[in-house]
Amino acid sequence: WARGLVAAWDGQLTKQSTAGAIYVRWESAVDDRALDPTTPQAERRALIEAGLQAAITRLTRDLGPDRSQWRHGRVHLSALPNMMVSTFDLPAVERPGGFGAVNANGANFRRIIDLSDLRNSVASNAPGQSAQPGSPFYGNLAENLGNGEYFPLLFVREDVEAGAAHRLTLQPR
């Protein structure tokens, strides 16, 4: 069943992809000799099959026997630990993509700057803008990270002022 699922797979590492979860675990389990063209065909087949069995064993161990729970997002997570106290850790976020994919990711902060029009610039900063637990901006962007969503990155003064939630004024003494 796993071979057929991966053979019919579209190659996209979406969070929901069962075939993607199997492939990623297979890729980490398969012996490098299986990909070496100088390895005899019969040995390569055996190594590939052993890698697939190892992937299934690992998915069963990590995610349980219910194959409907075998989703790529569950094996490709971004941890969101608090820098100071683990009590304030946020739940890990399921993410699409992965190493070797077009949507390779790892960083929780991204910026896309449009130098032709700064108003088109966007960013992602998970888990949020604030490192202070209890702030409404502490974990508010974690879901965006998992969905590959961005927020407008404000550069133009009137946009910054219109988008500000608070204003802090420092006055010298």
Model-derived regions: residue spans:
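C-terminal/peripheral segments of proteins
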Residues: 4, 8-173
